């Protein structure tokens, strides 16, 4: 690796809903934009308009009326590599304005990411972007680093997927990782559905963005769902109003806590899965009996879907009910948890001890994409 002190590694956390990118050593990502690639539905008729064949991120979002929008990452795992390449290109050249061939790049991956996917990421970085060095880190492990721990269980819930990942002394325990295909996007969909019951109709992809904003601004998690339902039905204390972009004002009441309740009761959206509290408990129970105490005492929340007010108290209450009665339970909800994966990456990539961990271009040229399994674990 080039031994210039001034070369800052790049950190890129590719989520299902948002890309978080920036420079190692910074305390927050410089660029945060939607993981969307949009292509025009119709060919341009105006000469000289300079229509692009694809738009990425916010630009795709703002032109969504004339585009077909695609998310290249589904449930946390890359499913469309051509579009993913466009997103990385946009990240480096338009958002961060850097030449990737001059910086080591740290990428993140979902837990239980297929082996072929890690190899493909590695290949694209070295062959398309000519990076001097790269590394692939597991998202949940980075969140734990960001909270200043090396042992604990992370509940990482984003837009497309949720995971519970037990980590011991810095290593994820793959046999105990559990995945739940229930996350932010499902909650937005559910809110769209229950708002329809109130007589408000939200159907298009543009309207989904409005509902997502309602969710982010007004939803919260009830400590006692039944009791909260009682309150909502008998008084207007939980009602709030929200102004739509066209000036119309809507009122939202019980929907505020009914929406994120799905995390604890997936049966509300017809899913057979266990809720996030049970999934966390099941994950802990798959671990060695000797380390469970450390896991119960370090339950760390991460990702945008854990941003609901009231989530830590409810989580604590639910897990206390499942765990052995003498067990000390601590749920940690760091205020910056929306970006804690990125922050953990920023910390890791700037550690002096990490510098020998990078996969260098020379090593890749010698061994090919499979080098990633030997160097990143």
Curated annotation (Swiss-Prot):
**Family annotation (SUPFAM superfamilies):** Actin-like ATPase domain (SSF53067)
The modified positions for N-acetylalanine read 2
Query: InterPro entries given for it?
Result: Actin, Actin/actin-like_CS, Actin_CS, ATPase_NBD
Q: What does it catalyze? A: ATP + H2O = ADP + phosphate + H(+)
Q: Which GO terms describe its cellular component?
A: chloroplast envelope; chloroplast stroma; cytoskeleton; cytosol; mitochondrion; plasmodesma
| Location within or outside the cell | Cytoplasm, Cytoskeleton
Name the source's superkingdom. Answer: Eukaryota
Q: In which tissues is it expressed?
A: Preferentially expressed in young and expanding tissues, floral organ primordia, developing seeds, and emerging inflorescence. Displays a very high expression level in mature pollen and pollen tubes. Little or no reproductive-gene expression is detected in vegetative organs, such as root, stems, leaves, sepals and petals.
GO MF entries: ATP binding; hydrolase activity; structural constituent of cytoskeleton
Keyword Cytoplasm annotated: yes
Q: What is its main location?
A: cytoplasm
Q: Which UniProt keywords apply?
A: Acetylation, ATP-binding, Cytoplasm, Cytoskeleton, Hydrolase, Nucleotide-binding
Q: Which residues form the signal peptide?
A: none
EC code: 3.6.4.-
UniProt lists the family membership as follows: Belongs to the actin family.
Q: How does it assemble?
A: Polymerization of globular actin (G-actin) leads to a structural filament (F-actin) in the form of a two-stranded helix. The binding of profilin to monomeric G-actin cause the sequestration of actin into profilactin complexes, and prevents the polymerization.
The task this protein performs is described as: Actins are highly conserved proteins that are involved in various types of cell motility and are ubiquitously expressed in all eukaryotic cells. Essential component of cell cytoskeleton; plays an important role in cytoplasmic streaming, cell shape determination, cell division, organelle movement and extension growth. This is considered as one of the reproductive actins.
- Miscellaneous information on this protein: There are 8 actin genes in A.thaliana.
* Name recorded for this polypeptide: Actin-11
What organism is the protein native to?
Arabidopsis thaliana
Gene designation: ACT11
């Amino acid at each position: 690796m080039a031994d210039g002190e001034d070369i800052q590694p790049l950190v890129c956390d590719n989520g299902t809903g948002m890309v978080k990118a920036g420079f190692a050593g910074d305390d927050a990502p410089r660029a945060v934009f939607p993981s969307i690639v949009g292509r025009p539905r119709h060919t341009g008729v105006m000469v000289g308009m300079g229509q692009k064949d694809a738009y990425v991120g916010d630009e795709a979002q703002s032109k969504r009326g004339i585009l077909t929008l695609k998310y290249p990452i589904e449930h946390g795992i890359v499913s469309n590599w051509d579009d993913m390449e466009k997103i990385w290109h946009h990240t480096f050249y338009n958002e961060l304005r850097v030449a990737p061939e001059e910086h080591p790049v740290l990428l993140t991956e979902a837990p239980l990411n297929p082996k072929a996917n890690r190899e493909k990421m590695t290949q694209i970085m070295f062959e398309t972007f000519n990076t001097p060095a790269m590394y692939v880190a597991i998202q949940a492990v980075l969140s734990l680093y960001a909270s200043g721990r090396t042992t604990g269980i992370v509940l990482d819930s984003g837009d497309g997927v949720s995971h519970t990942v037990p980590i011991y002394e810095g290593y994820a325990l793959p046999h105990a990782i559990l995945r739940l295909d229930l996350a932010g996007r499902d909650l937005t969909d559910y809110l769209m559905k229950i708002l329809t019951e109130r007589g408000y109709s939200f159907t298009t992809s543009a309207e989904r963005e409005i509902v997502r904003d309602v969710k982010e601004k007004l939803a919260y998690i009830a400590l006692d769902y039944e009791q909260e339902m009682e309150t909502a039905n008998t008084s207007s204390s939980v009602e709030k109003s929200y102004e739509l972009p066209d000036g119309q004002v809507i009122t939202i009441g019980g929907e505020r806590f009914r929406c994120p309740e799905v995390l604890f009761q997936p049966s509300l959206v017809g899913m057979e899965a266990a809720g996030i509290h049970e999934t966390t408990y099941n994950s802990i129970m798959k671990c060695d009996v000797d380390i469970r105490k450390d896991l119960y005492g370090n339950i760390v929340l991460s990702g945008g879907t854990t941003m609901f007010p009231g989530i830590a108290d409810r989580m604590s209450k639910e897990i206390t009910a499942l765990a052995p009665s003498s067990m000390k339970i601590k749920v940690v909800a760091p205020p910056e948890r929306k970006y804690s994966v990125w922050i953990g990456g920023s910390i890791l990539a700037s550690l002096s001890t990490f510098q020998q961990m990078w996969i260098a271009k020379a090593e890749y040229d010698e061994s090919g994409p499979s080098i990633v399994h030997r160097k990143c674990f």
